[in-house]
Amino acid sequence: MSRILVLYHSLWGHVEQMAEAEAEGARSVSGIQVDVRRVPETMPAETLAAVHAKTHQAAPEAHPDDLANYDGIIFGTPTRFGNMTGQMRNFLDRTGNLWQEGRLVGKVGSVFVSTATQHGGQETTLTSFHTFLFHQGMLVVGVPYSCTELMNMDEISGGTPYGASTMSKGDGSRQPSANELTIARFQGRHVAEITRKLFG
């Protein structure tokens, strides 16, 4: 049985919702075990309170060494100035031993993101995150246009061929749309199907 990890960082819960949709899509593929984990929060408690962060999230925290236990990993992060969050960056920077030992080489990797605005850096965050996957020797998977929701022009929506995405609005009031969650489920299923083909 192939194993997939959905690993995310979420401040207001938007990426958390997308992570659950990714996991739902992956679980729809038979012969796949899916775990959802989050990276440790590094922001001080008083700062989290000041920005009204969602501090209670069901997913347990992950350790960098956990990544080697999976055949596919789907990463999710909010965007900070066109890049992943510092919390996710801190977590990934602790995977040097995995890189030295080649323990992620040949595994499947994919990414989804959340931004505050429609043009808030979704694609730059996705593609810059891919650099980490390439350095680890992972096989990068996006969202093909067979996911017809990518072509939806009836509403403002996230979703790119590089990975699923959503928008939170500056105050966090906008929640992931049905279209965005459908794309996330598609991505999760797509990653799971490829992982199963590679690892059984």
Swiss-Prot record:
Annotated positions binding NAD(+): 12
Reactions accelerated catalytically: a quinone + NADH + H(+) = a quinol + NAD(+); a quinone + NADPH + H(+) = a quinol + NADP(+)
GO terms for cellular component: membrane
Boundaries of every Flavodoxin-like domain copy: 4-191
Superkingdom assignment: Bacteria
Keywords: Flavoprotein, FMN, NAD, NADP, Nucleotide-binding, Oxidoreductase
EC number of this enzyme: 1.6.5.2
UniProt protein name: NAD(P)H dehydrogenase (quinone)
Cofactor note: Binds 1 FMN per monomer.
UniProt cofactor(s): FMN
